[in-house]
Amino acid sequence: MYDRAPRWLDLANRGSTEEHVGPGTYQVPFPKQQATGCYAPFLSLSSKKDAYVVSSDPGKAVPGPAHYNVSQAQYKIKGGRTLQNREKRFKKLISDGPGPASYDCPYLGTLCIRIRQKICRKPAVSRSLDIPSIPSSGKSHGYHLNEDDTIMRRTPPSSDKTMGPAYYNPQFDYPKASLKYKGVNFGIATGRQELLKYSGPGPGHYDIIQKRKLRYENINIKRDQEHYCYSYVPRLYEEIALQEEKKGVPGPGKYNIKSQFDHIKSMSTIVDASSLLFFPETERFEPIKSSTPAPGTYNETRTAFKVPKKRSGLFSPFGQRAARFTEDYKAHELPGPGFYDISTNIVKAQVKKPHLKKKMKTGFGSSVPRALFAVQEKAFAGPGPSDYQVVRGIHDELPNLMNKYAAFLSREERTTPVQEMSLPAPGCYDVQKSYDMSQVQHNYMPPRSSVAKQRHSSFLSAAPRCLGKISDGPGPATYNPILMKSGAIISFVKAPRRFEEFQDKFSPGPTTYELSPFFRHSLLKRTYNVTLPCSASLNREHAGHAVQKTRQKYQRERFKHPN
């Protein structure tokens, strides 16, 4: 409602600076924030313009109430617009202090000698007017400016010739409060949002029924690539897949086409020479095998597992054909990566029939292959003669001569049998489920039998299983058990004793005492709340019987002698 913008009047008080000016020579005046009061609206007690801008005519220098244009602020409709950031992003900072170009400093090294002259700081004489913008009553007729710059208030005229308020005709077509827009921001819009129309084909321009054309597809050229007007740039994941496909396809110089004049080496070297006529023992239908060798096919010649040249059995000494560094033959029981046939999903038969192989002459008359079933012949992973231990002692049993795979007719087994263990296999456990039940959720398995259901609550109790030694309670020797003697004749009906012996610490119950019939009938007929004296001893009970007898005797004598 009030325009409280401060007005700075310190520009008139500034003067010139001295010749030599440094950072600590001048002080930049900062305007003081005065407390604003509400007693004068529109800052009417402050000056309207700066003091040094004074016109010769006081009427032009100080505007009156009619000089303000209020219609621009009144008829400006606020609202109805979206929030727009109309403020500048980078503001231009203007300092109130003097800048670097305001000083005239001589350059160093010159012969310019200037006389220090102190510049007069006296400001120019100017007339200052301090007239409130809204005059109060009695001061609305203006002021008179004298020659000595003094201000005198004008007196009101004796008669007023102006028209009164009844002669004015203010035209208020509509109130200014109705000009304030109070709706939504898009309700003031006069235009209508139009849909964008594209110049594409309509629904009837398409040809749904397409004619089938016979296309000849080339492997190296993609189909329908001619209608692409842009180059095909694969994405990252597509480029990785394309590179992997290129690795599997060999290049132009990678093929080795065999000619019909090339000499083909024989692949079967272990077959006997007598069986080479017309190949009678060759397989009729050979399995489809991949020409790619398995990972364990090749032997590295640079390592210590290099196989020496074969010698005949007559010239090979003991242990000459054995491997120098033996491996663990237990680790080769399972087939390797190259032993599977993907087309038939079975393991390749690496061990052929013994009668198809050429009998090799070896020392000590042993014709058993050294390698295991799942290991190739040239691997030499099986144990040698030096790996066996001779069992000393005389054995009653004969050697197992029927075992054709026993090396050197040894009674020791080549492969130790796997003992059947009662422990389950590693894959039988569910580690995640057991961890969650024991550490996270603490859930117990439900009982699986009727007996377990009865005892299930005992395992869930919080009481300790083994109680400690209780020293406060009585011991076994404290009690005095009464031993009942078993009689020959069993009496089903037993009359209770009239006078029983009780212990000293015995407290009588409600049925311990018995009243006489005389007192019993009198209590039932005459009284309802009677507290009987409790007798803890048997003497008091006997005394009650004696009193009862004396009263009965006294009543009999009274009937006999009424006077």
UniProtKB/Swiss-Prot annotation:
Region (Disordered): 131-163
Keyword Transmembrane: no
Residue spans of the STPGR repeats: 21-34, 63-73, 97-107, 200-219, 250-263, 292-321, 334-353, 423-438, 473-483, 507-518
Keyword list, A-Z: Repeat
Cited Pfam families: SHIPPO-rpt (PF07004)
InterPro entries in alphabetical order: CIMAP, SHIPPO-rpt
PANTHER family: SHIPPO-1-RELATED, SPERM-TAIL PG-RICH REPEAT-CONTAINING PROTEIN 2
Protein name according to UniProt: Sperm-tail PG-rich repeat-containing protein 2
Organism ancestry: Eukaryota, Metazoa, Chordata, Craniata, Vertebrata
